[in-house]
């Protein structure tokens, strides 16, 4: 398997685990020094190093806010150990779909990091009861 194929398989396993209703099972793909960086305004935001944080705070709870049954790829680009998934995903309890750009690094069959950016996240912020100034 090439680096690109391996990276594609690991990253796709995350989204498929969510879509199939067993997101926590993705924890087996995490390197123990896995790092996640997400916008600070989210409960799971900031930069966190260590697979335990992602397993306990993200994999165990993300489906409380994001509806993976309404997941789709806008685009999925992989080159060697780097993947960028631009996804559409539902916001739980609403008809809203938001767009998220997720940038992954994978090596030796393990996810090493994810960096996440949300586009127009107002429906998610409303669900989380986070007040946003502006429009």
Regions found by a protein language model. Name each.
Residues 1-135:
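C-terminal and inter-domain tail/linker signature
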């Amino acid at each position: 398997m090439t680096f690109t194929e391996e990276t594609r398989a690991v990253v796709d396993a995350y989204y498929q685990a969510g879509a199939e209703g067993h997101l926590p099972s993705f924890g087996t793909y995490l390197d123990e020094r896995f790092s996640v960086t997400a916008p600070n305004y989210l409960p799971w935001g900031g930069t966190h190093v260590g697979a335990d944080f992602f397993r306990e705070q993200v994999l165990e709870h993300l489906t409380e806010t994001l509806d993976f049954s309404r997941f789709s790829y806008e685009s999925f680009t992989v080159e060697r150990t780097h993947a960028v998934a631009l996804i559409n995903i539902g916001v739980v309890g609403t008809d809203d779909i938001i767009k998220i750009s997720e940038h992954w690094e994978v090596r030796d069959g393990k996810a090493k990091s994810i960096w996440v950016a949300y586009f127009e996240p107002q429906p998610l912020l409303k669900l989380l009861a986070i007040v946003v100034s502006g429009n």
